[in-house]
Amino acid sequence: MKKRINILLLAGLLFSAVACDDSENNFSESTSTRIEQTLERYKFALQAGKTWVMEYFPDENLGYGGWIYIVEFQDDRMVKAWFEGSTFVEADPLRTESEYRVEFSTGPMLKFATHNDYLHFFSFPGDNGAGYQGWKGDYEFTFMSLSPAFDEIILRGLKTGN
């Protein structure tokens, strides 16, 4: 019986090793080219002369409800933001504009790279009543989908998954 089990295990090992010899290329372009094309597509969609309405859910358990941001992405990697909760923030008007990046990390990502009093309100600790952990929000988002007409982009927060 033990000899049969060993023979079956050896046969399974050999068959699995043979099955790994599939070196056919399924794509016409390299991975890096496809990644760059995807990032360019998202950059184009963000900057397509549109002002975006961003529905934002800061807590992973949706504890704070949804908030509305109005964001405008510019060609020079700057984003202007207005926040529904702007009455809660003593913002310097110059800091409602900050840098953003579209880059590849765990997938194509949108990152609000420099501090913005509105866009980082839920993610940074401080004197906004959130204490040392902040409100547990995101400032890095994974692109989940882009509509063919470039009129809807679905993002998912890296930290909260919302």
Please name every model-derived segment.
Residues 16-19:
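C-terminal motif of bacterial Sec signal peptides marking the signal peptidase cleavage site
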Residues 21-109, 148-149:
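Acidic/polar, low-complexity intrinsically disordered N-terminal segments immediately downstream
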Residues 83-141:
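Contiguous, well-ordered beta-strand patches that form the walls/edges
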Residues 139-144, 150-152:
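Charged, amphipathic alpha-helical scaffolding segments
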